[in-house]
Design a protein with these regions (language model features):
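Membrane-proximal helix-loop-helix units in multi-pass membrane proteins
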Residues: 105-156
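Hydrophobic alpha-helical transmembrane segments of multipass integral membrane proteins
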Residues: 35-42, 46, 71-74, 104, ...
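Alpha-helical transmembrane segments of polytopic membrane proteins
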Residues: 62-70, 130-134, 183-185
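N-terminal juxtamembrane cytosolic/stromal segments of multi-pass membrane proteins
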Residues: 1-30
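Membrane-helix interface and helix-disruption motif detector
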Residues: 54-60, 120-128, 173-181
Length: 206
């Protein structure tokens, strides 16, 4: 007698279990990636906030520092993800690839939108800063929510919710305190997530 096809819930459970097992076996857990992003956000946005409070550092220097740190984080994330994906086949690989494409497509789309709004010239430089920081933190939160649902990861889902709250807070506090929110709330959220995932990996918890 043929086996009955799995339900959607059973399929998601299987994908989540396989993903956790692969991460443990291949050393591609999220702790290292989150730590890289925590470093980029804490140092990058922290330096940018400091630069706005002193006249000795040109404003563009903060942008360069953030860009360099983010390129590092993106490169490291790609390396860890590729290493973790070696030898993986089936639903887990497909879901992981689609999730990665979602990040890329969303980032490109949001960049086009923010650039176009900025080009209208109706916003001040302070408001442009709030636009970019708020929308990007919001996008990060939404995609982490999606990842948490896909892999049934409550910590990832909670991190996404925290990022969304931080996005709203960064706009409410205004410029230049929004950079401080990005550093403390955004970077701090990544750091806390990295620590929790690291403890889980060491203890073998799912």
């Amino acid at each position: 007698m043929d086996d009955e096809p799995m339900s959607a819930e059973e399929s998601l459970n299987l994908i989540a279990q396989q993903n956790r097992r692969n991460r443990r076996e291949l050393g591609g857990g999220p702790a290292r990636m989150l730590a890289a992003w925590a470093l980029a956000w804490l140092l990058g946005w922290g330096f940018t906030y400091f630069a706005t409070r002193t006249e000795s550092i040109p404003g563009w220097v903060g942008g360069v520092v953030v860009a360099v740190l983010f390129v590092f984080a993106i490169t490291y994330t790609g390396y860890v993800s590729a290493r973790a994906g070696r030898g993986i086949r089936g639903p887990s690989k497909t879901v992981g690839a689609m999730y990665g494409y979602s990040w890329a497509l969303s980032a490109i789309g949001l960049t086009v939108i923010d650039i176009r709004i900025t080009q209208f010239g109706s916003l001040s430089s302070d408001q442009v800063s709030l636009l970019w920081s708020g929308t990007w933190l919001l996008l990060t939160g939404v995609l982490y929510l999606a990842g948490g649902m896909l892999w049934q990861d409550k910590l990832m889902y909670g991190l996404g919710a925290w990022m969304i709250v931080s996005a709203g807070l960064s706009v409410l506090v205004g410029f230049p305190a929004n950079f401080l929110v990005l550093a403390i709330c955004g970077g701090g959220g990544f750091l806390l997530g990295a620590i929790v995932y690291f403890v889980r990996e060491k203890s073998g918890r799912r």
